[in-house]
Amino acid sequence: MSSSKFEEVINKIINDSPPGELREVYDDLIKITSENSKNTILDAIENYNVQNCIPIEVNGNSVIISKYNKEGAKFFDPVNSVIFSVNHLERKGLDIEPYEFTHAKIEKGQLKELHDKLHEYLLQSFPGDVSFAVYPVPEEISKISIIIVSTKYNPNNFWNGHWRSSYIYDLETRELSGQISTQVHYYEDGNVSFQSGKDINQSNVDDVVCTIRDIETNFENDLDLSFFDLNEKQFKALRRRLPVTRSKINWGSAIGSYRLGKNAAEGK
């Protein structure tokens, strides 16, 4: 296999990793491909972390890394005024230094004000581990990036979940665009992966945080309805006789016991 093809395969495997299980995927890949492939795998993990806006521990704070706060090989946090390197496997900040945020149009105070309002909303609405960020969009002087990441890892009960919502708000046109994505992986006596998402486009937005709250509440309600439909209709349509016991499965009780729908919606 050529080196480019090998890198492509490694990137595909890393990008398909379930939430909260990247370290296990890394360990398995090292066993399969040997230590000689370590740098290729770590490069793929770096790309995964940036694309998925993974939170990194920096001086006891959770800081989201993304393409919006990447500066060379480092990442900056404009609210806490630091710039840092990242150990992408351990998800920890290194070589942390002071950072002075400057922007042609957006002041640090504007970011801090939006940051604080967003914090209030998230404390009320996200019961899991939640991280968030407000970053200027490079080369787009009137645009701000807003990122929310919530994780709930429960390996003792064989499931992990991840919520990510990312938005771009234009201060001049008052337009808000973005995407919400969720993923849940359940792997006790099987392998069930659930993914859902929604594209967002809103105009005439004055209160950004209030609009985000409404959007995400509606998405959560739609998610509840889709789980109900999955439980009451889709899974029941799959009912069949088993070859050994020739008994029927009560799909309503079975899928209900997995708690995927309720826990994903409630962030448990």
Swiss-Prot record:
The keyword Flavoprotein does not apply. The keyword DNA-binding does not apply. InterPro entries: CapZ_alpha, CapZ_alpha/beta, CapZ_alpha/beta_2, CapZ_alpha_1, F-actin_cap_asu_CS. SUPFAM superfamilies: Subunits of heterodimeric actin filament capping protein Capz. The modification N-acetylserine is found at S2. GO terms for molecular function: actin filament binding. Keywords: Acetylation, Actin capping, Actin-binding, Cytoplasm, Cytoskeleton, Phosphoprotein. Pfam families: F-actin_cap_A. The modification Phosphoserine is found at S17. It is found in: Cytoplasm; Cytoplasm, Cytoskeleton, Actin patch; Cytoplasm, Cytoskeleton. GO terms for cellular component: actin cortical patch; actin cytoskeleton; cellular bud neck; cellular bud tip; cortical cytoskeleton; F-actin capping protein complex; incipient cellular bud site; mating projection tip. One of its GO terms (biological process) is barbed-end actin filament capping. Coiled coil: none annotated. Belongs to the F-actin-capping protein alpha subunit family. F-actin-capping proteins bind in a Ca(2+)-independent manner to the fast growing ends of actin filaments (barbed end) thereby blocking the exchange of subunits at these ends. Unlike other capping proteins (such as gelsolin and severin), these proteins do not sever actin filaments. Component of the F-actin capping complex, composed of a heterodimer of an alpha and a beta subunit. Interacts with BSP1 (via C-terminus); leading to recruitment of the F-actin capping complex to actin cortical patches and the acomyosin contractile ring. Present with 4380 molecules/cell in log phase SD medium. This is F-actin-capping protein subunit alpha. The gene is CAP1.
